[in-house]
């Protein structure tokens, strides 16, 4: 039986890859994976695309939307890929930084599960002696969910305020944990490894030197979180900086997924391993006068 490595990202646009997009993003690791090892699916129907409904589809093997929405996995039915593979003799491991998986019970059914805490205002440790500063203007970002009058962008940067270097970024930490797991378990096949990166979901806070490569002339406040509304709420330079933060975070994700793919290569696992790289959805960064994952508004043209 072949090993299975499932690599999930969140909010990773398909046109980040290769030369598919009008605004190029550097994704050398995934581009090489597509060329050398992968079958790329370019014509498809999306399933339940929000974070937990999407992963519920993957875990259960059936489409949940519109029969049920965002809910704990146990409420969606009995099937669970980890339990099914475990019954066939697979060792099963979940490694994630996505803050919603453990809340929805996805760790149940795995032999072992590990989460890096603190993504997207996941309040694992409070620092209330230190005030929560404004990460970006409130009128330029998503207003809810709100905590103590602070936006998600504010909460995220406050909780992770000591994280400045690349090694401290979530994609780096989670991928490093996956690399270590492969080194410590590759001699014990078959295994199922589910690695779940929440990046490049907003807030987009990669090292600013990476952002500068996409937007070297910008001198305003960093635009790290979209407003889930009209793109016209931003100036042209702010909107470009918003995209630059997203692009840099997507590049960072590519780099650290690349470290997992490189370790699979180092351990000579390709012939015995099915590797799946996927994402739940993309995001708007100015297209159709929207940023984020926005609803259709009453004032929108329906034709």
Please name every model-derived segment:
Residues 1-303:
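Catalytic domains that recognize anionic headgroups
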């Amino acid at each position: 039986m072949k090993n299975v490595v499932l690599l999930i990202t969140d909010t990773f646009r398909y046109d980040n890859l290769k030369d598919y997009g009008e605004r190029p993003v550097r994704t050398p690791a995934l581009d090489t994976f597509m060329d050398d090892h992968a079958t790329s699916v370019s014509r498809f129907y999306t399933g339940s695309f929000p974070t937990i409904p999407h992963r519920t589809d993957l875990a259960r093997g059936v489409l949940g939307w519109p029969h049920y929405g965002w809910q704990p996995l146990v409420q969606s039915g009995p099937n669970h890929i980890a339990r099914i593979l475990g019954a066939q003799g697979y060792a099963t491991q979940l490694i994630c930084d996505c803050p919603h998986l453990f809340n929805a019970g996805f760790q149940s059914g795995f032999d072992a599960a590990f989460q890096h805490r603190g993504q997207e205002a996941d309040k694992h440790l409070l620092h209330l002696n230190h005030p929560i500063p404004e990460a970006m203007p409130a009128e330029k970002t998503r207003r809810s969910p709100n905590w103590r009058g602070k936006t998600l962008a504010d909460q995220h940067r406050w909780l992770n305020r000591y994280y400045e270097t690349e090694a401290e970024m979530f994609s780096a930490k989670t991928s490093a944990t996956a690399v270590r797991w492969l080194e410590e378990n590759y001699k014990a096949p078959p295994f199922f490894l589910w690695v779940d990166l929440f990046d490049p979901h907003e807030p987009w806070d990669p090292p600013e030197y990476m952002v500068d490569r996409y937007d070297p002339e910008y001198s305003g406040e960093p635009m790290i979180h979209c407003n889930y509304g009209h793109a016209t709420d931003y100036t042209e330079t702010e909107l470009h900086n918003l995209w630059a933060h997203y692009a840099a975070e997507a590049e960072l994700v590519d780099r650290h997924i690349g470290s997992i793919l490189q370790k699979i290569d180092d351990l000579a696992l390709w012939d015995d391993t099915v590797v799946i790289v996927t994402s739940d959805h993309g995001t708007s960064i100015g297209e159709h006068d929207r940023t984020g994952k926005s609803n259709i508004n009453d004032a929108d043209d329906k034709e």
